[in-house]
Amino acid sequence: MLGAFNSTLARFGGLVHKVPWRLSQRRKYRHRQRLRAVDEVVDVLRTALQEKNQSCKRIESFVANHQPESQMSPKDKYTMFTRKTQGAGLQGFRKGVHKSPKWTRSTNRVNPTGF
């Protein structure tokens, strides 16, 4: 359009959601705290069930398949596997965890072997 009524992204697309290209120190800290909180809940549930001589398949499979936050490498904490992001070098097939939808509510601890 010409004149005073030039179109902008905000007018055409509604809200513009800007995602920073890397995680800030505060976001990394909060992400680590969320991972530790999940580990703590799993440990509490597991010990409570063991005291009663019971077990839960879901909790046992979580412990068997997922690393605790203290054992995860920074690459696994802050990036996740994606087929669509194919870059050169170390970041090939990985993208920042904050660029995935609902990254605070979904687990990002499982990656294919070799990636």
Swiss-Prot record:
Q: Classify the source by domain of life.
A: Eukaryota
UniProt transit peptide range: 1-23
Main subcellular localisation = mitochondrion
Gene Ontology CC, one term: mitochondrion
Pfam families in UniProt: L31 (PF09784)
The segments labelled Disordered in the record are 88-115
Task: Name the GO terms of the biological process aspect.
Answer: mitochondrial translation
Function text: Component of the mitochondrial ribosome (mitoribosome), a dedicated translation machinery responsible for the synthesis of mitochondrial genome-encoded proteins, including at least some of the essential transmembrane subunits of the mitochondrial respiratory chain. The mitoribosomes are attached to the mitochondrial inner membrane and translation products are cotranslationally integrated into the membrane.
Give the multimer and partner information: Component of the mitochondrial large ribosomal subunit (mt-LSU). Mature yeast 74S mitochondrial ribosomes consist of a small (37S) and a large (54S) subunit. The 37S small subunit contains a 15S ribosomal RNA (15S mt-rRNA) and at least 32 different proteins. The 54S large subunit contains a 21S rRNA (21S mt-rRNA) and at least 45 different proteins.
The protein in question is named Large ribosomal subunit protein mL60
At the highest ranks, the source species' classification is: Eukaryota, Fungi, Dikarya, Ascomycota, Taphrinomycotina
